[in-house]
Regions:
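Acidic, low-complexity, intrinsically disordered peripheral segments
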Residues: 3-7, 26-36, 248, 432-484
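Bacterial Sec-pathway N-terminal export signals of envelope proteins
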Residues: 25-97, 248, 255-290, 339, ...
Length: 484
């Protein structure tokens, strides 16, 4: 069989062109697109994946946050969505490489020229298609994919911040409910002592039946308050387990953290806080990336009606039964010029432009919401700081008043009504001091979250133990912007 040298040369050129693409075709991530999404990590395990938590010991606040970041389905969902968009970047990058296809066939050919007999034909071949130039369509699609990945990564970081705050809220809700239960038990004990004193005075004739009934009513109310507080503890335990990605029946022990006693108060320029928040809030970064993706979508839609230049290379070997095999090969350039698509391209461009306008409006909406979030959180923290001091003063005054009323009643110079009023005021003051103290923790965390800066350092302000090198939630690095 003679050799067609030009055909052999073309086949060699085909294999040479394909050889760089064949090796990474088997790789799991040839463009390192998925590598741009870091593994799920907790508060103090930035470089390493999440590790199983030790739930047998009492948990610090940082432990609760760490488990929540690693186990809450919301964080896993955000991580998976980021990987989806990272893979789409790889899909867009693949458009810059040639495509290779192979075919094989076995057929019977019937022809009158051969007396109607059947001949068996075998054929194998390979084809290469490579888009050389497309007026920026692939580049626009790649930019769109990269910006959508940036949006997904920023959305993941926003989710991390939200779960972080939810874990802080659940932690202090549980702490507050336990403290409220203890306060209700103290009030119940005081009400029982008052009831016993009223009963004793009634037996000796120095108290009226109304005094005894009032004391019984106050004690029954104290018992009811204690039962309600016990239910609040159960509800807080379930909420804490839920945010940690656990079953509500899972017992969780916490390291006690007393109510906050902040100093002079939080001082800060709210205007600068808003500016800082707009520079680092992940949801605003996501909105900006989605707008840029929409702008890239306009470029892609406009490039769809422009010509494309492609290279095509093919090689095949065919053989009829009983005959020698013969080779064939092709190489050529193809220019595809869209002439008319029924105005579909026109409306695709208009749709892309409208989408960009919508994303611009959404970006502005998020920008304004960021300012409002910071303003509300700032005001809430100022209020919480002042409430802690006022609640402490109220508790001190109510404690002295109750002690004086109890002493007067036991001495026989005070009325049961004065004592019960003082005890009710003390019970209310205890609850308000507890609530104000734990509300301050949540308000401080909420301000940090509103600025996109909720991190391990925030927990240090609460006196919580934070793992070393606990990082803030930061967007994963974007993939390289160089086209293949």
């Amino acid at each position: 069989m003679t050799t067609d040298f030009p055909a052999a040369l073309r086949r060699g050129a085909l294999l040479a062109a394909l050889s760089p693409a064949l090796a990474p075709a088997q790789a799991a991530d040839p463009f390192n697109a998925l590598a741009a999404v870091p593994p799920m990590a907790g508060l103090g395990t930035a470089p390493a994946p999440c590790q199983p938590a030790d739930l047998a010991r009492p948990l610090e606040l940082s432990d609760v946050v760490d488990v929540a970041l690693c186990s809450n389905p919301q964080t896993r969902l955000g991580w998976a969505n980021a990987r989806v968009q990272a893979a789409q970047v790889g899909v867009a990058q693949a458009a810059f490489l040639p495509t290779l296809g192979a075919s094989a066939s076995l057929s019977e050919v019937h022809s009158e020229a051969t007396g109607g007999g059947a001949r068996t034909q075998r054929r194998i071949g390979a084809d290469l298609a490579y888009v050389l130039y497309d007026f920026g369509a692939r580049a626009a699609s790649l930019e769109n994919a990269r910006q959508l990945f940036a949006a997904a990564a920023a959305t993941r970081d926003a989710t991390v911040q939200n779960v972080f705050l939810a874990a802080v809220q659940a932690f202090f809700q549980r702490q507050g409910s336990v403290a409220a239960l203890e306060a209700s038990r103290q009030s119940e004990k005081a009400a029982l002592e008052s009831l016993n004193a009223a009963e004793a005075r009634y037996r000796v004739g120095s108290a009226t039946p109304a005094d005894r009934l009032q004391a019984r009513t106050a004690h029954a109310q104290a018992v009811l308050n204690r039962i309600t507080a016990e239910g609040g503890v159960k509800a807080a335990e379930g909420a804490l387990a839920n945010v940690m990605g656990l079953e509500p029946t899972r017992p969780i022990a916490l390291v006690p953290l007393p109510p906050a006693s902040p100093g002079a108060g939080f001082e800060g320029d709210v205007t600068k806080l808003i500016e800082t928040a707009r520079a680092q809030r992940p949801d605003l970064a996501a909105a900006e990336a989605q707008y840029r993706a929409a702008r890239a979508g306009i470029d892609a839609a406009q490039a769809a009606h422009l010509p494309t230049l492609s290279l095509g290379v093919g090689a095949a070997r065919s053989q009829f039964a009983g005959q020698s095999a013969f080779d064939s090969s092709t190489i050529g350039l193809t220019v595809n010029i869209p002439l008319f698509s029924g105005y579909a391209t026109t409306y695709k461009v208009r749709a892309a432009e409208a989408q960009a306008e919508a994303q611009a409006a959404r970006r502005e909406q998020v920008r304004l919401q960021v300012g409002l979030d910071v303003w509300n959180a700032y005001a809430a923290l100022l209020t919480a700081t002042q409430s802690v001091k006022s609640a402490a003063d109220l508790l001190e005054s109510a404690t002295l008043s109750e002690a004086m009323a109890a002493g007067r009643y036991k001495a026989g110079v005070g009325s049961i009504l004065d004592l019960l009023t003082a005890q009710t005021a003390l019970a209310t003051a205890r609850q308000q001091r507890i609530q104000a103290g734990y509300n301050w923790y949540v308000a401080r965390a909420a301000l940090a979250q509103s600025m996109g800066a909720l991190e391990g350092a925030t927990l240090s302000e609460f006196g919580a133990v934070v793992p070393p090198h606990a990082p803030a939630a930061s967007p994963p690095p974007a993939p390289s912007r160089t086209t293949p």
